[in-house]
Amino acid sequence: MTPFTEGIILLCIGIFGLAGNLLSIPYFLRRRPGQKTFYTLFIYLSVCDIIVVIIGMLLFGVPKVSEKYAEETFLIIAPYILPTFEIGSTGGIYFTMAICIERYLVVCRPFWYREKAIKSTIYTIPIVCFSVLYNIPRFFELKTVIDYGPVYNDTNKYLSAKDKTFEITADFDEKMENVSIYSIEATAMRLNVAYYGIYHIGCAIIFQFIIPLLVLIVGNVMILKQLLKDSRGSSPMCSDGARGRFSPQVTQHRRRKSQIGRTRVTLAICGIFTACHLFKWVLNIYELYVRYNLSEKETEQLLNDSVWFETVVSISNTLVVLNSSINFYVYLLKICWMA
């Protein structure tokens, strides 16, 4: 598959996802106040998904279909939008975890949940603050460098960051004076071995792999066990909307059915999230293994000059954008299926 085709596919996924996420915000704002926490978390997840989708298209889609954009605009904005992409991605990970935790409390600890009357701010404020603070160092990792000078016939100028993250070839048919040539270079902080090992590998594996995976696995297993018990009628699930009073039998049955529906949506979203982020997690673990078991030269060859590694990275980026594009559609499909 050519890079142009890959870019078109990612852009189509992104446009489809952007439309869904933009529609999801007014949709969830109109939901019943009894499930305010669940829908508020979904709204924040949609905002994070919008950030990931828009910037994902600018980073991984548009450069593959527009040479002019890739040679100038991309190289100017990449050092700033790449950290913003990571903020949205981190927020998406932790809001998915928050939705899973909220469903666990509603399903497995309904009376405690109703008694404590937990509000959405308990989740949203820490997640937003953590997502921003955790990714602040990324704003100081890359910089755009502009070179000025004449360019002659048949001259190919190869530009790349010091870590070979970005590269560009500029071809000119005739002599041109004072041409601006853009490139991206890694800063001294980004090139620091200790910083890269601790932040990019160690922290990424802990905060973006181990913790999310454990929370999602444990939370979903507990939810599934409780749903199985509930389906046998041994432990009726209480609604988070029925705080402080018990509803009539029919109303309670409807609320219980609605809760089960939202819980199944959560299980589906968590499963899709895990599948779409699996490539990213595998890449982090593989990079950790390579950097600590091979020489520097072998590491550079495997990570920067390997076609298969670039292909896996491209697939990983596409899957991350895909995950941020389909959450609302999963919710709608589940609601339609229940109806």
Where are these regions (language model features)?
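Extracellular TM2-ECL1-early TM3 structural module of rhodopsin-like
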Residues: 2-11, 34-116
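Intracellular effector-coupling site of seven-transmembrane GPCRs
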Residues: 42, 47-48, 157-194, 225-282, ...
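Loop architecture of class A 7-transmembrane GPCRs
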Residues: 66-88, 120, 130-210, 290-307
